[in-house]
Amino acid sequence: MNSSLPYLEWESKLGNVHIEGGFNYSHGNLVVPRKGKYRVYLQITYEGDQSESCNGEKMVLKNSVFLFSDSYRKDTLLLSSQDTVKCDMHNWSKSLYTAASFELEANSRLWVRSSHPGFIAKNYVFTFFGAEFQTGHVSDT
């Protein structure tokens, strides 16, 4: 996972970006294969300890999933989750999960931003992103 970009890049070969069901993954984006209703989901687990950089008494962790579609042509916030950790905690771990269903157009792109990418857990089992097709017409594009 590349954390130096304004969006997160995922390792599609190890399984932390889920690209089943016709999705393509390209440069941090999940590309929607066809028009329909999709369940979009994201979990990011953060880890750290008090010796790592933390300003103030607490750190606010925030994840966001954005959508870019050809019809709107602007990044739109779809999902967001946030929580806080106290800066004096030793060896802390915090998982943030969010999911919801949306009507998406074919070729729309989903991407993720994290407030603190340097604290994302290195074990891919705890951090994942994807979408599942729920309903729609297979021939719709």
Describe the residue ranges of each PLM region.
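Terminal (often C-terminal
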Residues: 1-35, 39-52, 124-141
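Short beta-strand-plus-loop segments that form exposed binding edges in beta-rich domains
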Residues: 112-119
